[in-house]
Design a protein with these regions (language model features):
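Structural/interface elements that position substrates and couple domains in central-metabolism enzymes
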Residues: 2-120
Length: 121
């Protein structure tokens, strides 16, 4: 079986999909098809409950694709990799850590506090 590797050559075994907290952000970083693809490689996907609501994707659709639904953002953020649509917001800075692989868009010029939080982690 193939494995998914981070930039530091550490195997990614779990991926978290938190609900986006930015105002008026309705997208979600992973669809059920993405869950199925990662499951093929033995990666466990944990989706925060309601993460897909803004994109009309139900928790049940994620479960049918093989994901586990977790009740809190902390549960989603505690995985090897986290996938998001937008940069972390200040209320998410506490979830950043040295061994986290974060896959997201970053607009650091407009949000220097995000750059500082990422460097500090």
């Amino acid at each position: 079986m193939m494995s998914i590797m981070s930039a530091s050559e550490t195997a990614i075994r779990t991926v978290g999909v938190p609900r986006e907290v930015k105002t008026a952000e309705h997208r979600v970083a992973m669809t059920p098809d993405g869950v199925r693809e990662l499951e093929r490689y033995g990666v466990e996907v944990l989706v925060e409950t309601g993460a897909g609501e803004g994109a009309s994707i139900t928790d049940a659709a994620y479960v049918a694709a093989g994901a586990d639904i977790v009740p809190t953002a902390a549960d989603a953020w505690s995985q090897d990799m986290v996938v998001k649509v937008k940069e972390p917001k200040p209320e998410e800075f506490g979830f950043l850590r040295d061994d986290l692989t974060l896959f997201t868009y970053l607009h650091l010029a407009a949000y220097p506090a995000v750059a500082e939080a990422l460097i500090a982690a």
